[in-house]
Every structure is written in structure tokens, then in C-alpha cells.
């Protein structure tokens, strides 16, 4: 298949499920990560052959079934870094990046800051704070083994030191004192609370 044919297939599936701007972003994310095909490559050499690294029809089906692109790609971008993701770990929201940027701006000159991230998920908050505030000691907790596995993987891949701990925060905080506690837990609707 050519680059253009692959792009058209992926974009067509995304366009059936998303608004045009979002469809392009979804197609670009999935093509680049899962197929190794950047949109600029499609523009520059649309007729160049492109070997497939994935089953294109299955990929198109996943996109068309409204599965989030970040789960299809297996990653998300957060504060300029690439974080592994999989189902069972929530996709960080743009406002979470704003929260992290605000913390970094306010505490950039603080030395030895002790930070606790509650409900770390993918580890994006904890790992980014460890990277941006290198003198900080960051602890991250989550109740989910899946989340902790992904968060540890992200910290290792991005070469950041974060202490991860499995903990239900409702049963008590981790040992130690903290200068800053940060959390951006998932939103729970009233109907979900009743379940």
C-alpha cells in the first residue's frame, strides 16, 4: 500500500467517528505510533510504498468504534513527554498539564520539596514533577496495580526517580511528611457513585 492509501484508510475511519479537526489528530497519532507513518511523509511522498506494521482493518475498526486514540496508540503526550497508556489507566486531561505547570512555576526555586501524588495513574504528574523539579522527592500512590505498573514503566523510560506505592488513600496516607500534595483523580458521576 502507498502512504496515501494508508492515511486515507485511517483518516476515513476517524472521520466517521470524530469531528474533522479531531479526526485528523486521531489519524496522525495512530498512523505515527502504530504504523510509523507521519503525516508529513504522506504529503512529501504520497505514492511511496509503506510496509504495514499492524493490521490496518483492525486498526480502522478500533478507531471507528470510538476507542480513544491514546489507547489505540498506547501512549499520550503530557507536558512534552510521551507516556505509555493502556486501558485501566485514565488519559490525562489538558487541564492536568496546567496544574503541573502551575506547580513547577511556583516551586521551581524550592529545594528538597517533598511531593505526594495521589491516584497517580500513568504517573504523568509525578514523573513530570520529578523531571521539572530535580531536587524534589516525589512519592506517588495508586490503588491500581495496572496503574502502578504503567507509572513505573514511564518513570524508568523517562529516567526519573519516583517512589511508587500501592495504597488506598482512604485508609491512610503513606509514611512521611509532604510539602505538597497533588491529585487529579477521575471524575465520578452521581450514577457511578450509586453503583
Where are these regions (language model features)?
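Conserved SAM/SAH cofactor-binding pocket of Class I
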Residues: 95-194
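Residues that form generic nucleotide/phosphate-binding pockets
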Residues: 13, 17, 59-63, 187
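Charged catalytic carboxylate motif
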Residues: 6, 26, 55, 95-98, ...
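Non-catalytic accessory regions of SAM-dependent methyltransferases
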Residues: 1-47
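Non-catalytic, surface-exposed connector residues within folded enzymatic/regulatory domains
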Residues: 21-25, 72, 93, 141
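Conserved AdoMet
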Residues: 32-105
